[in-house]
A protein has these predicted regions:
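Conserved active-site neighborhood of the chymotrypsin/trypsin-like protease fold
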Residues: 27-30, 58-59, 76-156, 218-219, ...
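Gly/Ser-enriched beta-turn/beta-hairpin loop segments
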Residues: 59-67, 111-117, 155-158, 169-185, ...
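N-terminal activation segment of mature serine protease catalytic domains
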Residues: 20-64, 70-73, 82, 95, ...
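Active-site region of chymotrypsin-like
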Residues: 125-133, 161-219, 227, 232, ...
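C-terminal recognition in membrane/secretory proteostasis and scaffolding
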Residues: 1-28, 41, 109, 141, ...
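Terminal peptide-recognition signature
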Residues: 48-53, 74, 81, 85, ...
Length: 345
């Protein structure tokens, strides 16, 4: 699968997108497909679930006097006040206000976020919220019409609507941080600064993605996080406050030029293993402090996004094999099973 280098949509000058449609994350019922609606009917169905997220950030350095501010979008996914948005939108945020479709502003707080998926969960206390229906569709088709809804540039007058098609599926792009975003929907629906975190909706009025990134050097190429890929993690974010990843007993670090220089590495790609615990799965399986992981079950690894995505691809198999730079044999790691989630309060 080709990995395309791209730029994330910034907050108040970044380039990000919208979110989506299916059953409530606390429900196990899959919603059957509705009839196709007109675009105005789709907008009428979803618009009240789309919010504006206004942020004030922490100064990037002590020399900065004024904190930066920004705006983005989000989508209500639960009557209890949970809102799905992008991690890049809330990173370094000092305070946050959420603008509802009614025009009301209410304080918001980040309750979970994950930089590898660029996903965040915001919580507000408000009454009469209208959650969107999330739709982790496995049958989304190239050429299918989709609608992006968000609040680009924090313009007055409510959310903005753009229409396009699914241009491609299962895209992977490289972020400026050197990590890879996977399972992206490519669309030609216009995504602009401030659209980040808003929904990409199919013509049944259900969210199939969360708008996240654009290709700045190309025309009509935007990307959304696939709801099919992120939906399994939403309940964990609501209950645990984080996305579940197995505790293998080491700290993975993406190898960058600065990491190479700091540790005197001769390998220029992969994931560096630090703080290996000899009593946990990685150490028991033969991983040593300072090892460089270059593949997981023969899937090449260039960064932490690659590493965790490869582990997810392992499915229910009990072990994975890590290929290590400069070592003849792999390390075989036994994967721990996740603890059962308790019902959300």
């Amino acid at each position: 699968m080709a990995i395309l280098p791209l730029i994330l949509i910034p907050v108040a000058g970044l380039l990000f997108g919208s979110s989506g449609a299916w059953a409530n994350p606390g429900s196990s019922a899959v919603v059957s497909a509705d009839k196709t609606l007109s675009v105005p009917a789709v907008v009428a169905k979803v618009r009240s679930s789309v919010v504006t997220i206004l942020t004030r950030g922490v100064p990037a350095s002590p020399s900065q006097v004024q904190s930066g501010s920004g705006s983005g979008s989000g989508v209500i996914i639960d009557e209890g006040g949970y809102i799905l948005t992008n991690n890049h939108l809330v990173t370094g945020v000092k305070s946050m206000a959420v603008g509802l479709s009614t025009g009301r502003l209410t304080p918001g707080r980040v309750v979970a976020r994950d930089f590898l998926l660029d996903l965040a969960l915001v919580k507000i206390n408000a009454q009469d919220l209208v959650p969107a229906v999330l739709n982790p569709r496995p049958d989304l088709e190239i050429g299918e019409s989709v609608v992006a809804i968000g609040n680009p540039l924090a313009l007055k007058g409510g959310s903005t609507v753009t229409v396009g098609v699914v241009s491609a599926l299962d895209r992977s792009v490289l972020t400026p941080d050197g990590e890879t975003l996977y399972d992206l929907i490519q669309t030609d629906a216009a995504i602009n600064p401030g659209n980040s975190g808003g929904p990409l909706v199919d013509l049944s009025g259900r969210v199939v993605g969360i708008n996240v990134i654009i290709a700045p050097s190309a025309q009509a190429i935007s990307y959304a996080l696939s709801m099919q890929a992120i939906y399994p993690h939403i309940q964990s974010m609501m209950v645990r406050g984080s996305i579940y990843r197995p505790d293998l007993g080491f700290t993975p670090v993406t190898i960058t030029p600065s990491v190479m220089a700091s540790f005197g590495l001769d390998g220029d790609r992969g994931v560096l293993a630090l703080q290996v615990d000899a009593a946990k799965p990685a150490g028991v399986g033969g991983l040593q402090n300072g090892d460089i992981i270059t593949a997981v079950d023969q899937h090449q690894v260039f960064n932490m996004g690659d590493f965790w995505h490869a582990l997810l691809r392992s499915g229910d198999q009990p072990t994975v094999q890590l290929t290590l730079h400069g070592r003849s044999g792999p390390a075989t790691i036994q994967l721990p099973k996740p603890a059962a989630l308790k019902a959300a309060q």
